[in-house]
Amino acid sequence: MTTNGGQIAFKDLLKNHKGKTTVIEVWASWCSDCVKAMPKVKELQANHPEVAFTFISMDKTADKWLAGIEKHELKGAHYMANDQMKGVFGQAIDLDWIPRYIILDKTGKIVLYRAIEKDFDLINETLNKLK
């Protein structure tokens, strides 16, 4: 779901950032590890202004998701998976923990697939290599 209530397929979401290195964060407003990691995400954004950031929420309701975006002042593209962690999207990426970070290079190739909140050094290192 998009922030204006529309629907978008994951492949179309990826097309929006074609030609740019992209960090996808899978998160939820109720996830304490996600909230704790927000300052690190903002630091990544400040250090890598050339990178597109896409946030995919696992929240159960759009109200909580949208409130979480505003509360944490998240900058980037925002989407909500309608079926939470165990749904189609979660199963497709073998989602077992959030936050989850996925990095795509400028061609759309996945270069980092299973990073979590403890992997910010690896995330930063990967982004530096893609400059």
Predicted regions: what they are:
Residues 1-22, 39:
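A short beta-strand-turn-helix
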Residues 24, 65, 101:
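Hydrophobic, well-ordered secondary-structure elements that form the walls
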Residues 43-85, 95-98:
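Conserved segment of the thioredoxin-like fold in thiol-based oxidoreductases
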Residues 9-12, 64, 85-89:
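Short acidic active-site motifs
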Residues 19-22, 71-76, 123:
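Conserved N-terminal glycine/acidic-rich loop preference
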Residues 74, 81-128:
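Thiol/disulfide oxidoreductase modules built on the thioredoxin-like
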Residues 26-43:
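Conserved redox-active cysteine motifs that mediate thiol-disulfide chemistry
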Residues 20-22, 26-30, 97:
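Short pre-active-site segment immediately N-terminal to redox-active cysteine/selenocysteine motifs
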